[in-house]
Amino acid sequence: MRIYNSATHKKEEFQPIESGKVRMYVCGPTVYDNIHIGNARTFISFDVIRRWLIASGYEVTFAQNLTDVDDKIIKRANEQGRTAAEVATEFSDKFIGVMRAANVLDPDVRPRATKEIGPMIAMIKTLIEQGHAYAADNGDVYFAVRSDPNYGQVSGRNIDDLMVGARIEENEDKNDPLDFALWKAAKPGEPSWPSPWGEGRPGWHTECAAMVHRYLGTPIDIHGGGSDLAFPHHENECAQATCAWHQGFSSTWMHTGMLLVDGEKMSKSLGNFFTLAEVLEQHSAAALRLLMLQTSYRSPLDFSWERLEGAENSLTRIAGTVENLRWAANHATADADEAASEAFAAKAAETRATFKECMDDDFNTAGAMGAVFGFVTECNQYLEQAGDAADKAAALAAADTLVELLDTFGVELPEPKVELPLGLLGVAAGLVAYTGDDVDEAAAKILEARAEARAAKNWDLADAIRDQLKDLGLTIEDTAAGTRIKTL
């Protein structure tokens, strides 16, 4: 397996620190509002990556934090006349709920910043003791960026270049404009905790570094997030961790690309800003995931409602193929062609191999989905050629292949509507004098009568059958593998 490392700008052979085990951390949200689909793109991408690592046999420990104390949370609380804790609790719950609605697996560990103040203070004390941080007279504590000779290793930025044309907040309490806050002195009305430097709260970058170390240990195998976090957040995380504990922070850094809407940056002012909850009210989680899978996680993703509708249609097509394969397997009336069956079975094995090859190449979901779509076409061609002589084992194996590969991605196919109503017994009694109580047998008798009526050009009877079925919410579908009654 090869993974693109954002820090080295190249694909590298993935070698976990501990054989067979992967420790993985992805930065969670600052919980002051509902997450938008750009945020969701990152979380869904890493959910797919995590699922593939698990499918590949790794024992994955996945941690994701909730930043529940931050300037944005405090600002929102003040605007609404609420406490920061109330705002954070509301949007933490909403985040967890919408992630589950999007079929994103819960993390193994979900630490909340406000519950981890002790480890953060301990890390800051260590940094001060080792000369990498200092306390200002006003109660703030800052990381001394120039004390870290490796600063810039995550983002590839040079310290001197950062000073050229950079928008750096002037702060007379800092020794250097590049230094960043590890601890912020308390302000009136803001949440705070006691510390050796007085009442205050942790800086954002401090939170993740301390939580990674506490719950996963360092170094970890994979640290991920959106590309906008590479600098300064991930750079500053890494600087603190490596200076505090004198070991690597993450073997591999992974970052997802930006999400665009109809080719433009998402913005409330442009009217193209959508929350994940809003999207899931109109479309399935599977369709949204399928849309995202068709672009590399590292590349910009262009979202549009038309593309999302197209993804829904693709799901319906795949689900229909799976349904047709299973139906053909259970309703074949002639002997299957052995050579054709073997060739078809080989196509399924080839699809699985191509899928794995793509996913092992930096999680190339676009290539993997290309293999799936190609196999769907081959399945439909096989059914058309086989007619009523489909090979049961090969057809069922093909259906399982499609379902299992998509399940690896967390894509659930829509359930086919196959349960026939008891009212069909009455239709069969009136049309073909059927007196039994087996709905499936009644359906078969009706189809026989329709076939005979069409052969005899008795269009009145054929139309009567169609109309009475329609009244029950049913229709007759003619496929290459045969004819069946299904729900509308």
What are these regions (language model features)?
Residues 1-32, 47, 118-328:
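Alpha-helical recognition segments enriched in aromatics with Gly/Pro capping
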Residues 8-11, 17-105, 482-485:
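N-terminal, positively charged nucleic-acid-binding surface of large information/translation enzymes
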Residues 54, 100, 128-129, 254, ...:
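Alpha-helix C-terminal capping/helix-coil junction sites
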Residues 58, 132, 474:
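Short phosphate-binding/catalytic loops that engage adenosine nucleotides
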Residues 66-71, 92-95, 105-120, 138-147:
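Short, glycine/charge-rich beta-strand/loop segments that flank catalytic centers
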Residues 77-84, 108-114, 198, 226:
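The substrate-binding groove and active-site-proximal loops of carbohydrate-active enzymes
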Residues 106, 136-138, 478-482:
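Short Gly/Ser/Thr- and Asp/Glu-enriched loop/turn motifs at secondary-structure junctions
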Residues 275-488:
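Structural preference for alpha-helix termini/caps and helix-kink/transition segments
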